[in-house]
């Protein structure tokens, strides 16, 4: 597991990383010992889906390209544990208290997850109580724990109709010992952490602290990342809703651009290090002409040439840009937010200024050129989930309760190859999933957007030359250092 943290995985899709770096131990979920309590649901007696035996799916079942066979099959021997309801439980339902905490930025589906965890615990397992901790991990601190609320069926029955989170949220870590002390003092047996990679890294510290002698606490993560960049997962809740809402923004930008003489519409979307929302919105809308994502860095000159090419073809241009693109275009203020995320420069505003300046410089060629800028990010994050995302949230939360009651801990619930699986938190937070520039999604983007393959290739070659030059400089420095020691 430790070798993964030394991998340089930035901008490299997780599935392209060598399988030799992922071991069976990395994907093995810890379970608290002993399952002596019977599931209170009578359905487990006859229903096959209530099982104690853990089933698995292959980590990567896709056919391997290097196999010379008429029907190639996967040679990957690594497996992931399938999530399911269990016949026997680790925790005695009538004596079990469940805790829920939501952290980080809001996202469509948070209330759905809170609702489903609460109702599954109360109705299916008849647990003693469900407690909601307010405003992120602060709610687990000694001071914040005073604001905790007990959740009932009536409290959560209708919350899925609204965006945001009824528990509130915040960024930033808290002392793990203090948080576990709160869980022990309030007699919480299972803590569900709903949040992104920063939240789950915090959950990992709670999980490690909860291992201290005499404690019997399960820590279970429900991952929330609207960017859809979670490792070992092909889908995270809120992502599909975000794409649907983002398409509306692109359509508005298109309406503005097409109504003007040489109109340019710019839409900035979420995506700090992964451009899944921008890429899928570009394909789904079929009205964006340029897609800019962090995985495909381009200089200002190339972007301006892309705009020029589009305006020459048609008197309008729509640009979709992910917030993490072009962070080298201007020097940022530096620093990090409370969650440890690097503060980004506002690429949407910068791009707008650059395009306006370029249009002024080319006024004779593109008279009356106008730029319209739309940033729908906070509107997207705050809306309730689509019906498909709501269903997904319910499935994730329900299975999370089933597995946690059976003693699964230190893991998250996710979807991979259309199966709900369990992944250890340490593995899930060790690498970020990004858009593959050689994959089908980016191929679709390239097919429907304007391109300057020669310019992009030239830029990539220049970047490679700069990298090689830096390596040569470093090599000469090492040789000189060694020579001085002789």
Curated annotation (Swiss-Prot):
Superkingdom as given in the UniProt entry: Eukaryota
Keyword Ribosomal protein in record: no
Annotated catalysed reactions: beta-D-fructose 6-phosphate + ATP = beta-D-fructose 1,6-bisphosphate + ADP + H(+)
Pathway: Carbohydrate degradation; glycolysis; D-glyceraldehyde 3-phosphate and glycerone phosphate from D-glucose: step 3/4
Gene Ontology cellular-component terms listed: glycosome
Residues bound to substrate: 225-227, 270-272, 323, 378-381
Necessary cofactors: Mg(2+)
SUPFAM superfamilies the record matches: Phosphofructokinase
Keyword Metal-binding in record: yes
GO BP terms: fructose 6-phosphate metabolic process
Active site: 227
Placement of sequence motif Peroxisomal targeting signal: 484-486
Annotated control of activity: Allosterically activated by AMP.
Pfam families with a match to the protein in the record: PFK
Binding residues annotated for Mg(2+), in chain numbering: 197
Signal peptide positions on this chain: none
Keywords from the named record: Allosteric enzyme, ATP-binding, Glycolysis, Glycosome, Kinase, Magnesium, Metal-binding, Nucleotide-binding, Peroxisome, Transferase
InterPro entries: ATP_PFK, PFKA, Phosphofructokinase_dom, PKF_sf, PyroP-dep_PFK_TP0108
Main function: Catalyzes the phosphorylation of D-fructose 6-phosphate to fructose 1,6-bisphosphate by ATP, the first committing step of glycolysis.
Protein family (similarity comment): Belongs to the phosphofructokinase type A (PFKA) family. PPi-dependent PFK group II subfamily. Atypical ATP-dependent clade 'X' sub-subfamily.
Assembly, per entry: Homotetramer.
Protein name per the record: ATP-dependent 6-phosphofructokinase
Gene name, Swiss-Prot/TrEMBL: pfk
